[in-house]
Amino acid sequence: MKPTTESQQGRIDAVGRLEAAIGRPLDVVNVYHQWADDFPSASDFQFVQQGKILLISWNGNDIRSILSGSQDAVITARASAIKRLAEPVLLRWRWEMNRPNLQKSIGSAADYIAAWKHIRTIFTAVGATNVGWVWCPLATNFSATNGPSYYPGDDQVDWLCTDVYPGPTDASFASVSAEFMTWAAAHAKPIVIAEYGSESSNPDKAQWISAAAAYARGNSQIKAMVYFDADRVENGVDRNFRLEGTTGPLQAFHAMVTNTYFDQRKGG
């Protein structure tokens, strides 16, 4: 969810508004941090104190600079800070690495994998054992964008992950994620859907959300889903995924998250 004001309190308030709208606390909060950010932040600590699991989306630096060793101090500082948090954290470093517009900074798949292993080695040396490593490509055109080639290996990854967006044709969650889910079935790893959502321009947004929930219920490998409750402008186009201010979509999401299957407090 996007805060009204870009501040630590703004982030906390944004989560609180969404929780009030859906009628229950969130179990997982996806927090975004740039490469050089000092995190966990004050709002991150607050979310942990509220009993939420942090899914930290850590934006990647240029891969070549990571491999050169010039970023080791940054990596060590973040590993030490997360270790001090002393609570389980899901770490999603440089997600959507197969996205075409990221290829200049990513380099080759081999470079990406080497950087992943370099970062994880430093975290291990620091003793940040409370980290679950989340590998998260974009679901759209997973095979055509060579998504599988970026996989660091079962020994390097704790959680599989993908981001699912319907695109301009309002394609279903099932169809967009199909290639990734087929690939993931061959790996004995839990899956978190770290971002998913339908734009307000979709007249069937509520149905899309309900169908996504039904799909997840039918696939036991999916253990968590995080809705992308934000709006953003891309190439001059307003893309609004938000639930607040809607009726049908918000009701569909409320029905999903209060169902015992998705609400771990109710035994889901």
Q: How does the language model describe each region?
A:
Residues 1-88, 176, 204-220, 228, ...:
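N-terminal carbohydrate-binding/catalytic regions of secreted carbohydrate-active enzymes
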Residues 42-52, 57-59, 155, 159-202:
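Glycoside hydrolase catalytic-domain groove-lining segments
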Residues 29, 91, 158-160, 195, ...:
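Conserved, mostly hydrophobic/aromatic
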Residues 71-159, 163-179, 186, 234-255:
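Active-site cleft segment of glycoside hydrolase catalytic domains centered on the general acid/base Glu
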Residues 35-38, 61-64, 98-100, 140-142, ...:
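Short acidic, S/G/P-rich loop/turn micro-motifs used as interaction or catalytic elements
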